Amino acid sequence: MTAQPQVLKIRRPDDWHIHLRDDDMLKTVVPYTSEFYGRAIVMPNLVPPVTTVAAAIAYRQRIMDAVPAGHDFTPLMTCYLTDSLDPAELERGFNEGVFTAAKLYPANATTNSSHGVTSTDAIMPVLERMEKLGMPLLVHGEVTHAEIDIFDREARFIDTVMEPLRQRLPGLKVVFEHITTKDAAEYVRDGNELLAATITPQHLMFNRNHMLVGGIRPHLYCLPVLKRNIHQQALRELVASGFSRAFLGTDSAPHARHRKEASCGCAGCFNAPTALGSYATVFEEMNALQHFEAFCSLNGPRFYGLPVNESYVELVREETTVVDSIALPNDSLVPFLAGETVRWTMKR
């Protein structure tokens, strides 16, 4: 039997999908990402959303102000697409190196998405400009029609929105974010080099039973919602295969405890403190640690056309108990896997 590795040394990873929020929350959560990641694609769903170059520059500065001394971290900013967005503003931001990508939220699909896009037809001039520029489109892939069951919204999105869009704009670079279904895993796997996907730790580790059986676990509630185990297994098999167009995107989405543990709780898992160890655990369970570094550190830069990070990080096999909560000025944050014992720990 092969001896278990005790240390995993990988190139410094990047997080290709994260929510850093703003104000006190921003100051609290940024260090958990900047300590170990070289770059992160920062979601623009603030209130109001980041829709201009000036807003993105200002937000980027607030993020950098929250990065502790000694951390080597670069936030990559995104533009929030709206029906009224000017293509020229998007192009200027991309050409000036302010916007790395643009984010399509179907209106009301998730937290702070009420300004989102009503239909791809409404933003076709913007999408055509992005295709011409080679600018990546990041997609929250769910339809939002009230009559569509929440567990079916991703699969329906592929058929009714994603595939027609990619047929219409075949040169458009698309990241299908936080995929959660067998349908999406197969769709991305069978796609061409212009289609990639991010996958979160929670969708690899858990399915809807973990969230709903024996009591409801609000800190596993995120959007897209956890699906049944056959979908979880399809995601695990995709990453374990070494598929090169799937990469790390935590979708870490912090909410204060009172907003999660509520009669109408918010969607999102704050997984930044525990994500890398969680991914390592999944890859080890799937006997696929040989593909772990590529998923975390190589596949994303290749798709985005960016250099890989030069430095390295290490995870050590050391059982650690995740803290129950993290202090906020007037509340607390509950991290993903709070109170649980984890197998892999980041070496500081």
UniProtKB/Swiss-Prot annotation:
Instruction: Give the main EC class.
Output: hydrolase
Q: Which SUPFAM superfamilies match?
A: Metallo-dependent hydrolases (SSF51556)
Cofactor note text:
Binds 2 Zn(2+) ions per subunit.
Q: Tell me which residues bind Zn(2+) 1.
A: 17, 19, 103, 251
Which pathway does it serve? Pyrimidine metabolism; UMP biosynthesis via de novo pathway; (S)-dihydroorotate from bicarbonate: step 3/3
Q: Which Gene3D superfamilies match?
A: Metal-dependent hydrolases
Q: Which UniProt keywords apply?
A: Hydrolase, Metal-binding, Pyrimidine biosynthesis, Zinc
PANTHER family linked to this entry: DIHYDROOROTASE (PTHR43137:SF1)
Its quaternary organisation is:
Homodimer.
Entry protein name: Dihydroorotase
